[in-house]
């Protein structure tokens, strides 16, 4: 029997997104490989490159943290499912939440960086290292609007400008069709360029250890 969906802790109108390094996520006290579903573990076991495996694991864990913050469920009850409409099979394709059919989820990973997003309606996230330069231009011209390619070519750093347009396009692609807003920013601390496309306004949060509880000590009456 499926447990009833719990009420969402937020206002239900704002998407949540987070970006982190793979190391930050794997060091989080509430996130670990044991949270993954059996089908996720099978896919993880098939990845031969250790760094890529860690990135995939961290992205899936970060998505659980986003879902937990959005829905009020703990991370161990925030597992996404995946389904591919093209081959009519589960285990891959666009992620979704069983208990919240109106909520969109998305994840991304690239070279030690991970991103995740959850929100009402469609949502997509993409993260890339700030030093990456997409190309070649002949390929980008088939993916990006011509106006974006021209604008990037005229920028002081065309490569950096193209990267920003690229992450926006990837986030939109993951979110799907519709009237989408795009929030794009550079996380200088992690040297990452991030974009979130969503039907609702989006906000971000920082991944890190939960703050230790504040201990109130009794006041010394002699002082």
Regions found by a protein language model. Name each.
Residues 1-223:
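Core catalytic alpha/beta fold that binds nucleotide/phospho-ligands
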